[in-house]
Amino acid sequence: MHRILIVDDEPLIGQGLNSLLASSGIGIEAIYVAHNGYEALDYIRMEDIDLLITDIQMGAMSGIELMHQAKLVRPWIQTIVISAHETFQYAQLAMRLGAKDYLIKPLDGVQLLDSVRNALLKLEKRSKSREETIDTLRDSFRVEEPSALQTALLNNLLSEDVNSMKPSAAELHKLGIGLGGPYFAVLKLRLLPRSAIASNNPPSERDAQLLRYAALNITAELLAETERKSVVFYSGADELSIVIQWDEESYENTSVSKLDQLDMIGRSLHRSMKRYLGLTTIVSISQIANGLQSLVLLNKQAMQALQWSERHPDHDVFYYGDFHESLYTKEETSEDELHAQHNRIAEGAKAYIDRNYAQKGLTLHEVAQNNHVSPNYLSYLFKKTNGMNLWEYVMKLRMEESRRLLLETDMRRYEIAERVGYESPEHFSKIFKKYYGISPSELKK
């Protein structure tokens, strides 16, 4: 059963799509309707939305911006875009952000339902037990390992060994390996199969090989969907290396943060390995640098970030730039020093939210940027330090202030909604009732 969010600033279209989906017979648990991007983001943060159906041209926040913000919250969310404009530029932007379809208004009901079914198909796969996963792999896969020569050359390219001869981009190209760059980042994916498997029943060598091969293929498939040029290869018994690259044009395109792109890839990889293979993983992400020769440094960064999982066993995706090297490279660094650093970051974020919680369009990216860490790491530290996630804290402040204004002032509902950061009084009332169990008007009585 799936949860679908419809976003359109024309209420009649939203209602019509809601009715169409509700009577379709598709396995839908809940349908939500939002009238602008801000309302939609509240639903995405509060509910486990599987599919987003959004208009591309709306008021304060476009469908393109909504897609980007939605991916930051839930990188795996499926999206269908609807538009009154048959414009290639809009369609291209939507597809780059992972839209599964781009439909032109007036909508054809049959076409929309077909698109919804197709988008939900990928979500139908459930997490399998280890035994089911291995049985499926035995039946379905004829393992064709990647070329040993290609794997050796790629690992050599990342190696710190000064005596090794690094292959050139031209030499790699002859072998079918495209690494033109010129901008690169390195990700490491460490598979922890034994953490998901009872210690008294370890996998056979053959089964471990099957899982590793499946992980390589899932990684390649996921990266192909992101339209990022990449190379994936083995770099150890339980480890994959991923080289992400940007050409000059895509790197200079600032419409989407490169760090956000890498973070979304990392989180999607972690989730996919758990969902489809039942494997626990750790993902590390380097910074971005120019030139093929930078891969040695970037690989070193990714390796270092991977080691930081020992300090944070309850975290999964590590970005090198999040960690103060002066703290993490000292063997004598105490837990108190690390705890103090984490508190400073979390408290800085909390202070920023205290000042800006009523701002319409406040984003996790904005709060993270203000505190000089990635959104993923800030989310982790904030919840660990404060016992609630960042958006729960934003909502707490908004609801407490709106309750105070209702009880202590004569302000109207639309004025209070505006004051605490909501686009419409109707949406504010829904959130308020969900939070307190009564509507603003009932509290006012």
Model-derived features: positions:
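Generic solvent-exposed, charged/amphipathic alpha-helical segments
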Residues: 18, 216-220, 266-274, 303
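Flexible, glycine/charge-rich interdomain/linker segments that couple
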Residues: 135, 279-292, 308-340
